[in-house]
């Protein structure tokens, strides 16, 4: 029922005993629960490739439900066989030289007597340059230059938008749409009302019958801008509908080219599921083929070479991190947990697609570990464990003492220890980054998370179908967004003092909305499979219960409308120009939401690693780009 957040739930003792019970008391209780004869070490079994539910009788005679998920697709031998030469110093040295040359391009644009620009193109050149380095995944090297360029553009921004240059007589759609999008993404206060200026006398966005390449590119940037909508911005919704239709029609008319591929990519992934490293990989292909780029007075060949080098240099780091992650997975005893899914490589891929700065290794590995543990817990609480066992496990985890594991069924001991060890380990990493101990904070998040799972396990066991409100509030917790995000972001070189942390973690609106979208989107992709496994409660079924006569289609329409509203709310929480919290402090929580959203874009990409999931792993982690 859950995938991989958490808001406080009412405190309750699942054992109807004080959580301060001694280890002796817990051992007395646990004697009534037999073990399964499973150990933490040994060779992994290979589950079926299907997603059906099976039942199995353990050696203690307990009949258990078990999801028949496929096994880990990326075995140790395969990971160890990966090779790369891009970790050699010569590649880093070449990249550093190119970084210096690109900085000179930025600086030349800022010079009064610069050769690259004129008063007739100085605005679009700056915006295009910023947009290009961001889409190519190399913006981290040019933060000061980007700010300087956008400050300049914003100084000429007006309620009528901008033209190509500061001396342009009228604003044009391409410059205004791309400028609006880029400025908004960087926290500048720009109103969507500026787009109304590009409507005709009938209130419709105007276009020509011929659909020239220049116009198509302008509408493409209008579409990209429309996806960064805030709540209540009707013109952005209108722009999205118009531009999506226009671009789909244009694909039927233009020849196969870099432009057509760029349109397909943007229509396919939008913004909320277009993960930065995936976009960089795709844009490298498009950027290298785009003949329009060669007309620019900016040296695009150097931009492209730098993007390729940076992609491959990070690829060499990914190989080392993957090798470490696979060793951790094996040493933790995870392969012996045959009742659950093993998607640690896929989770690492998502992390490396949203945080590919070399120094954020702790974030990538911490996220992959947390999500792996969450998936184990999901399968244990939803299918494999009995209610009595799960109550015992929940109470034992709240004691946060390794001796509490002694009273657990054998298969639960491994789960307890991997959670206990990993949370403690990540807390030590977070303490180095934040300068304070955050373990108690993390423990409370995990306690609330397990309480939400326990609630769902009882619903399954009793066949209770909650109201939508009951389900939704608990489901935002059990979605796992908070527990997957909290500790990993604390390992980063971004300060999270308490007053900032409360604005990105619980009880912030950002955390609530990010958790909501994971719960709602997950339900739209999983509810049928969950129902087949005996997990009736979902936002779809609960909505239908609350609204007698409503069909599944009605429920899905309602949930999808909620998702659209949540997305706009998330945009606002991230980009609100009046917020006291820097975008950099919120961005990774927001991007984790995007990563999970991508996993559910087509179907449940976590239970079954579909073609799109495997392609993402290969294109962003396994295969380098050709220089």
Swiss-Prot record:
Cofactor(s) required for function per UniProt: Mg(2+); Mn(2+)
Induction: By wounding and insect attack.
Organism domain of life: Eukaryota
Keywords, alphabetical: Chloroplast, Lyase, Magnesium, Manganese, Metal-binding, Plastid, Transit peptide
Involved pathway(s): Terpene metabolism; oleoresin biosynthesis
Catalytic reaction equation(s): (2E)-geranyl diphosphate = (1S,5S)-alpha-pinene + diphosphate; (2E)-geranyl diphosphate = (1S,5S)-beta-pinene + diphosphate
InterPro entries on file: Isoprenoid_synthase_dom_sf (IPR008949), Terpene_cyclase-like_1_C (IPR034741), Terpene_cyclase_plant_C1 (IPR044814), Terpene_synth_N (IPR001906), Terpene_synth_N_sf (IPR036965), Terpene_synthase-like (IPR050148), Terpene_synthase_metal-bd (IPR005630), Terpenoid_cyclase/PrenylTrfase (IPR008930)
Entry EC number(s): 4.2.3.119, 4.2.3.120
Entry binding sites for Mg(2+) 3: 530
Amino acids binding Mg(2+) 1: 378, 382
GO biological process: alpha-pinene biosynthetic process; diterpenoid biosynthetic process; green leaf volatile biosynthetic process; monoterpenoid biosynthetic process
The keyword Phosphoprotein appears for this protein: no
Range annotated as the organelle transit peptide: 1-36
Residues annotated to bind Mg(2+) 2: 378, 382
Record-level Gene Ontology MF annotations: lyase activity; magnesium ion binding; pinene synthase activity
Enzyme class: lyase
TM region(s), chain numbering: none
Localization per record: Plastid, Chloroplast
Intervals of motif DDXXD motif: 378-382
Main location: plastid
CC per GO annotation: chloroplast
Domain notes from UniProt: The Asp-Asp-Xaa-Xaa-Asp/Glu (DDXXD/E) motif is important for the catalytic activity, presumably through binding to Mg(2+).
Family: Belongs to the terpene synthase family. Tpsd subfamily.
Its job: Involved in defensive oleoresin formation in conifers in response to insect attack or other injury. Involved in monoterpene (C10) olefins biosynthesis. A mixture of alpha- and beta-pinene (35:10) is produced by this enzyme.
UniProt protein name: (-)-alpha-pinene synthase 2, chloroplastic
């Amino acid at each position: 029922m859950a995938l991989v957040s958490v808001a406080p739930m009412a405190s309750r003792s699942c054992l109807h005993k004080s959580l301060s019970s001694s280890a002796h008391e817990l051992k007395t209780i646990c004697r009534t629960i037999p073990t399964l004869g499973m150990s933490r070490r040994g060779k992994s079994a290979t589950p079926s490739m299907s997603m059906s539910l099976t039942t199995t009788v353990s050696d203690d005679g307990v009949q258990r439900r078990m999801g028949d998920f496929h096994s880990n697709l990326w075995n140790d031998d395969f990971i160890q066989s990966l090779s790369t030469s891009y970790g050699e110093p010569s590649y880093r040295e070449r990249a550093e030289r190119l970084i210096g040359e690109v900085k000179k391009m930025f600086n030349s644009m800022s010079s009064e007597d610069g050769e690259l620009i004129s008063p007739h193109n100085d605005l679009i050149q700056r915006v295009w340059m910023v947009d290009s380095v961001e889409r190519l995944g190399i913006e981290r090297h040019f933060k000061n230059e980007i700010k300087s360029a956008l400050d300049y553009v914003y100084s000429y921004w007006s309620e009528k938008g901008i033209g190509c240059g500061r001396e342009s007589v009228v604003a044009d759609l391409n410059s205004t749409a791309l400028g609006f999008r880029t400025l908004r993404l960087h926290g500048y206060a720009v109103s969507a009302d500026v787009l109304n200026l590009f409507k005709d006398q009938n209130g419709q966005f105007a276009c020509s019958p011929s659909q020239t390449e220049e116009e198509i590119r302008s509408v493409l940037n209008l579409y990209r801008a429309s996806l960064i909508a805030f709540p209540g911005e009707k013109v952005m919704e209108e722009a999205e509908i118009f531009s999506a239709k226009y671009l789909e029609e244009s694909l039927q008319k233009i020849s196969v080219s870099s432009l057509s591929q760029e349109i397909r990519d943007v229509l396919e992934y939008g913004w909320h599921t277009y993960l930065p490293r995936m976009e960089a990989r795709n844009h490298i292909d498009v950027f290298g083929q785009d003949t329009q780029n060669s007309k620019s007075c900016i040296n695009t060949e150097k931009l492209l070479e730098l993007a390729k080098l940076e992609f491959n240099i990070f690829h060499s780091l990914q190989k080392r991190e993957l090798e470490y992650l696979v060793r951790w997975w094996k040493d933790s005893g995870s392969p012996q947990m045959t009742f659950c899914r093993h998607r640690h490589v896929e989770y690492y891929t998502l992390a490396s697609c949203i945080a590919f700065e070399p120094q954020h290794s702790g974030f990538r590995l911490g996220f992959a570990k947390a999500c792996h543990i969450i998936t184990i817990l999901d399968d244990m609480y939803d299918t494999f464990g009995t209610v009595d066992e799960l109550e015992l496990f929940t109470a034992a985890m709240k004691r946060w003492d390794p001796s509490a594991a002694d009273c657990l069924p054998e298969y639960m001991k491994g789960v307890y220890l991997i959670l206990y060890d990993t949370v403690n380990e990540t807390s030590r990493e977070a303490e180095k980054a934040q300068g304070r101990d955050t373990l108690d904070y993390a423990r409370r998040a995990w306690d609330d998370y397990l309480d939400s799972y326990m609630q769902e396990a009882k619903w399954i066991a009793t066949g209770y179908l909650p109201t939508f409100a009951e389900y939704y509030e608990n489901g935002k917790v059990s979605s796992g967004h908070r527990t997957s995000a909290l500790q990993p972001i604390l390992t980063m070189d971004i300060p999270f003092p308490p007053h900032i942390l409360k604005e990105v973690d619980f009880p912030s609106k950002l955390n609530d909305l990010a958790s909501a979208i994971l719960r709602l989107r997950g339900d739209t992709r999983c509810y049928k499979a969950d129902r087949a496994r005996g997990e009736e409660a979902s936002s779809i079924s609960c909505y239908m219960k609350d609204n007698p006569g409503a069909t599944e289609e009605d429920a899905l329409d309602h949930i999808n409308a909620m998702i659209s509203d949540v997305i706009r709310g998330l945009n606002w929480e991230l980009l609100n120009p009046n917020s006291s919290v820097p975008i950099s402090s919120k961005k990774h929580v927001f991007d984790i939401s995007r990563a999970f959203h991508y996993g559910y874009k087509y179907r449940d990409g976590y239970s079954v690693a579909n073609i799109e999931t495997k392609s993402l792993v290969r294109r962003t982690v396994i295969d380098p780009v050709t220089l």
